[in-house]
């Protein structure tokens, strides 16, 4: 019953709403989410006058902003939290899923989401800063789409409201999404360790949940652990992927050719059609960089900034690095392996087989260990996101915060034993619904973020 419902909602959100015929008999399938995301990204890219390119130095500079309050987060720390979820699961499992379903051409779709998604990420993160509030439970600040949607409705209706329907729907969708991601995490880790060390799924699932419980049920552990783990694991993973690319430099032009040939239908891709290829890439690009979905603003709101724009610049930088740099590295690891060795494989089997080709047994063990660490960072990151949404729905009390953490741990356990396709569908449904509710408000509320950008640039010119 639940599986059937999830599949139907998934088809509505991600299924082909429009079919455009293309030369050669192929078709371009466009889903509801793509119809929302791509025009929104283009619109804000134009309105910000190509901010990701113009203000790239400002993005880097914003990372070193210092915080003044003890319990608040610096801009760099909020980037660490959002990067934990982006670089964690999205760059490994998300890229694997995109290429498994859509072939090499899906990588091009992911690049598209990053280029235009950076501007969307800037707008939503800036709004999160504008409408943040003090967090009486954890200290510091909290906010996100549920809060700036609420503020927009109050401003329009000119009266105070306890709850706003769209904000409630967004918060619930977020909790569904993050429960789905929890299952993807354990599903991928269990599969990886089974391939690397022949550990039965039930044993690895129990260990994963037990270690996660020790961390997440402590009040102040999340950001501290992420501060330690994320920079180290990202640098190590990046170094290994660069090594593999250098080892296969001669094959690199062929990989680029394959990406573009499959993306534009010149070569038959795994999913069979031009539309399906781009669909998978764009969908996984969203899952990876989160631009437009409303996830990262939950972290951006926690930053202590002297100007809201700086939080937006940090998150725009995160989208660029996440997809253009790190996602591409993962894609190249798989695509630089001989096609005959990875044909027919999916999930972590595909990535581990590719790593074994490049680095032998060490590659398999490295990916298993990396995925374990990435998964923990992702799990901690999504629980950080969930804080503000749980608080919006249930108020300031520890009972509801703890209850959601326990629910997430249960989902982590179920995911270790569930079917691969279903756990992805649940996450896709949640992030799809979040995106709809978020983007509906981004157009009218985005004007305030654009006004802040003008003030920021005016101040710079003085």
Regions found by a protein language model. Give the residues of each.
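N-terminal alpha-helical transmembrane segments of multi-pass membrane transport
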Residues: 1-89, 99-106, 117, 441-462
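Membrane-interface loop-to-helix entry segments
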Residues: 36, 44-60, 166, 187-193, ...
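Helix-loop-helix module between adjacent transmembrane segments
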Residues: 40-45, 113-141, 150-187, 191-215, ...
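Alpha-helical membrane segments and immediately flanking helix-loop junctions
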Residues: 69-101, 127-130, 137-153, 169-172, ...
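Selective recognition of specific alpha-helical transmembrane segments in multi-pass small-molecule
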Residues: 116-124, 204-219, 230-250, 283-286, ...
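Extracellular/periplasmic helix-exit of transmembrane alpha-helices
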Residues: 124-136, 242-258, 272, 302-305, ...
């Amino acid at each position: 019953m639940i599986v059937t419902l999830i599949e139907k909602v998934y088809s509505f959100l991600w299924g082909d709403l429009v079919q455009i015929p293309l030369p050669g008999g192929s078709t371009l399938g466009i889903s509801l989410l793509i119809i929302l995301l791509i025009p929104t990204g283009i619109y804000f890219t134009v309105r910000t006058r190509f901010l990701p390119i113009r203000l790239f130095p400002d993005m880097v500079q914003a990372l070193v902003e210092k915080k003044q309050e003890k319990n608040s987060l610096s801009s760099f720390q909020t980037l660490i939290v959002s990067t934990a979820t982006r670089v964690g699961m999205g760059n490994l499992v998300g890229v694997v899923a995109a290429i498994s379903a859509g072939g090499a051409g899906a990588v091009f779709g992911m690049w598209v989401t990053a280029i235009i998604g950076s501007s969307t990420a800037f707008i939503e993160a800036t709004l999160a800063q504008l409408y943040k509030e003090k967090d009486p439970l954890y200290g510091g600040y909290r906010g996100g789409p549920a809060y700036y949607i609420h503020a927009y409705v109050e401003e329009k209706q000119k009266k105070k409201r306890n709850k706003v329907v769209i904000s409630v729907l967004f918060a619930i969708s977020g909790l569904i999404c993050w429960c789905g991601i929890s299952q993807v995490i354990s599903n991928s880790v269990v599969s990886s360790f089974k391939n690397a060390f022949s550990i039965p799924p039930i044993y690895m699932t129990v260990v994963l949940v037990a270690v996660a419980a020790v961390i997440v049920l402590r009040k102040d552990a999340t950001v501290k652990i992420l501060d330690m783990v994320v920079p180290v694991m990202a640098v190590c993973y990046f170094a290994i992927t660069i090594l593999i690319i250098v080892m296969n430099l001669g094959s690199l032009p062929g990989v680029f050719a394959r990406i573009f040939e499959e993306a534009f239908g010149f070569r038959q891709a795994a999913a069979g059609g031009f539309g399906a290829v781009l669909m998978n890439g764009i969908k996984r690009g969203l899952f990876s960089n989160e631009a437009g979905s409303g996830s990262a603003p939950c972290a951006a709101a926690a930053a202590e900034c002297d100007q809201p724009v700086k939080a937006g610049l940090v998150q725009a930088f995160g989208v660029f690095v996440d997809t253009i740099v790190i996602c591409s590295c993962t894609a190249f690891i798989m695509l630089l392996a001989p096609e005959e060795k990875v044909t027919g494989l999916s999930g972590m089997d595909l990535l581990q087989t590719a790593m074994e080709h490049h680095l032998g047994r060490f590659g398999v063990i490295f990916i298993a260990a990396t995925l374990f660490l990435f998964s923990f960072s992702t799990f901690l990151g999504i629980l950080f996101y969930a804080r503000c949404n749980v608080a919006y729905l249930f108020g300031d009390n520890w009972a509801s915060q703890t209850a959601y953490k326990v629910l997430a741990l249960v989902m982590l356990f179920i995911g270790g034993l569930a079917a691969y396709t279903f756990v992805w569908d649940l996450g896709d449904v949640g992030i799809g619904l979040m995106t709809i509710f978020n983007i509906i408000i981004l157009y009218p509320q985005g004007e305030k973020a654009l006004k802040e950008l003008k003030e920021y640039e005016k101040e710079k010119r003085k």
